[in-house]
Amino acid sequence: MIIPVRCFTCGSLIADKWDAFSTRVRAGEDPGKVLDDLNVKRLCCRRSLLTHVDIIREVVNYTRPI
């Protein structure tokens, strides 16, 4: 839903890289090259960014007002 602030495995900060990563991948760049450019080297951090599914916009439509 929301990108984790830190990697679940190693605790490295990854949320600050999400906007740049998702923008560049949507523009058609290779995800591996983008992660290399963003200096994401650990496999656990790469996995967290590569496998994240951003569905928050879809879920917001189903929440009830308080």
Swiss-Prot record:
Note on cofactor: Binds 1 zinc ion.
Protein residues bound to Zn(2+): C7, C10, C44, C45
This protein's record includes keyword Acyltransferase: no
Main location: cytoplasm
Keyword S-adenosyl-L-methionine annotated: no
GO terms under biological process: DNA-templated transcription
A GO term from the CC aspect: DNA-directed RNA polymerase complex
Parts forming coiled coils: none
Cofactor(s) this protein cannot do without: Zn(2+)
GO molecular function: DNA binding; DNA-directed RNA polymerase activity; zinc ion binding
EC number per UniProt: 2.7.7.6
Keywords recorded for this protein, A-Z: Cytoplasm, DNA-directed RNA polymerase, Metal-binding, Nucleotidyltransferase, Transcription, Transferase, Zinc
SUPFAM superfamilies: RNA polymerase subunit RPB10 (SSF46924)
Annotated catalysed reactions: RNA(n) + a ribonucleoside 5'-triphosphate = RNA(n+1) + diphosphate
UniProt-annotated location(s): Cytoplasm
Record PANTHER family: DNA-DIRECTED RNA POLYMERASES I, II, AND III SUBUNIT RPABC5 (PTHR23431:SF3), DNA-DIRECTED RNA POLYMERASES I, II, AND III SUBUNIT RPABC5 FAMILY MEMBER (PTHR23431)
Annotated NCBIfam families: PRK04016.1
Quaternary structure and partners: Part of the RNA polymerase complex.
Family stated for the protein in its record: Belongs to the archaeal Rpo10/eukaryotic RPB10 RNA polymerase subunit family.
Function: DNA-dependent RNA polymerase (RNAP) catalyzes the transcription of DNA into RNA using the four ribonucleoside triphosphates as substrates.
Name listed for the protein in its UniProt record: DNA-directed RNA polymerase subunit Rpo10
Organism: Metallosphaera sedula (strain ATCC 51363 / DSM 5348 / JCM 9185 / NBRC 15509 / TH2)
